[in-house]
């Protein structure tokens, strides 16, 4: 079915005979991989042609896409400004958006598939954790890491995802009239750009007209999540710090992106008690959130703004961190609550920069999200010109 189809992999996936750099110069002297990552091997066995390892943020630790070592891919939707390609699967999204590849595979720990897809006007699917075999993939957070395809259409994501999992069964469209969606009314729309809001509301009207039942609902559990972040910390930080401890406390730190070093070291302020408390409270909050969602799908803007000019972010570290946090806000909610998610283009703003809609559901409901996306993609993308 996919024999001869080109595919490329974010530079976290081991490709036999090639050094996996994870976007960092500090790994350039590592020995080449002796074996393919599990998914790379699955793609090859299906006849897919692995043609490249793709650019990314150093160690996958940002939603902006900046890489001072190997260069930051240009967002193809602006020929003048060097806008953010999104991160951390920046090269994966740009390669697909430019038409260089039909599909690329990325990873997502806080939004790193869905954000680049949104900024570049393509489809990005973040699977549930454990949905794909992670063997041979350089980690960031063993609790939160997940994988998924970036492609031009939902159908392409479904097709490639099925092959990489070695499945014979297919995912088909859901009956639109049986769908129930929830729009969160808190957190996710704070500071949203006008065009993102307008395109989102227009997409809601179209899918409502098609038969989807829409309910708007406040999620107090979101407020609890952000309060937990403020008072205790997050899951990702300590896991990244443990992984990179020797790098950020040794000579390698001077060769790393200072933004990445600073972000990793932020977790030093968390105690072991804080980390355990976050893990325990996370499970309770996931259960509470799932009870709020029940059988519905959560729909929201993938990110509150379109891709931004990267120059000010390169020059001002404080601005970089503030922008990164806002960019990741909506998607990282999904990672914390262990959702799967599908980003679909919803239109453009006055500068022809893409906006995006995100469909999400609790862990293990990947088929529901993808089948809903198959049914609704053409309606959501109507007049998107992407």
What are these regions (language model features)?
Residues 20-29, 193-194, 308-316:
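Glycine/threonine-rich flexible loop motifs
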Residues 8, 27-31, 145-152, 265-270, ...:
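Short, well-ordered beta-strand elements within core beta-sheets of diverse protein domains
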Residues 2-25, 82, 176-178, 234-286, ...:
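Short helix-loop capping/hinge segments that flank enzyme active sites or metal/cofactor-binding pockets
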Residues 1-109, 205, 210-211, 290:
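Gly/Ser-rich catalytic/binding loops embedded in alpha/beta enzyme cores
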Residues 12, 187, 303-306:
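Short glycine-rich anion-binding loops that position phosphate/pyrophosphate groups of nucleotides
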Residues 243-336:
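Serine-dependent amide/ester hydrolase catalytic core
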Residues 178-187, 217-232, 257-269:
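Flexible, acidic loop-helix segments that line cofactor/substrate-binding pockets
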Residues 45, 98-190, 201-210, 276, ...:
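Structural helix-boundary/capping segments
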């Amino acid at each position: 079915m996919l024999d001869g189809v080109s595919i490329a992999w974010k530079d976290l996936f081991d490709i036999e005979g090639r050094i996996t750099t994870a976007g960092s110069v500090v790994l350039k002297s590592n020995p080449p991989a002796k074996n393919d990552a599990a998914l790379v091997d699955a793609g090859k066995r299906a006849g897919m042609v692995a043609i490249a390892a793709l650019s990314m943020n150093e160690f996958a630790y940002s939603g902006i896409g900046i890489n001072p070592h190997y260069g930051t891919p240009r967002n193809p939707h602006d020929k003048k400004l060097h806008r953010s390609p999104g991160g951390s699967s920046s090269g994966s999204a740009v390669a697909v958006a430019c038409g260089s590849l039909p599909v690329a595979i990325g990873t997502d720990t806080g939004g790193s598939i869905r954000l680049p897809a949104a900024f570049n006007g393509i489809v990005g699917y973040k699977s549930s954790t454990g949905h794909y075999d992670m063997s041979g993939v350089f980690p960031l957070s063993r609790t939160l890491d997940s994988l998924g395809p970036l492609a031009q259409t939902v159908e392409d994501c479904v097709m490639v995802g099925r092959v990489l999992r070695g499945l014979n069964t297919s995912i088909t469209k859901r009956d639109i009239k049986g769908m129930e969606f929830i729009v969160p009314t808190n957190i996710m729309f704070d500071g949203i750009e006008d065009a993102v809001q307008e395109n989102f509301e227009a997409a809601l009207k179209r899918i409502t007209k098609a038969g989807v039942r829409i309910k708007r609902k406040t999620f107090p559990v979101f407020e609890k999540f952000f309060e937990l972040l403020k008072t205790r910390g997050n899951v990702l930080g300590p896991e990244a710090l443990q992984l990179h401890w020797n790098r950020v406390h040794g000579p390698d730190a001077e060769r790393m992106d200072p933004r990445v070093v600073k972000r990793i070291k932020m977790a030093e302020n968390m105690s072991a008690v804080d980390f355990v408390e976050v893990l325990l409270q996370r499970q309770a909050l996931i259960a509470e959130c799932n009870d709020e969602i029940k059988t519905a799908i959560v729909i929201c803007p993938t990110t509150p703004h379109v891709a931004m000019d990267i120059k000010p972010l390169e020059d001002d570290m404080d601005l970089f961190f503030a922008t990164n946090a806002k960019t990741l806000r909506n998607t990282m909610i999904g990672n914390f609550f262990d959702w799967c998610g599908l980003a679909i283009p919803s239109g453009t703003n006055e500068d022809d920069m893409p906006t995006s809609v995100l469909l999400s559901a609790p862990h293990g409901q990947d088929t529901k999200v993808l089948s809903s996306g198959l049914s609704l993609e053409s309606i959501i993308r109507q007049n998107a010109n992407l």
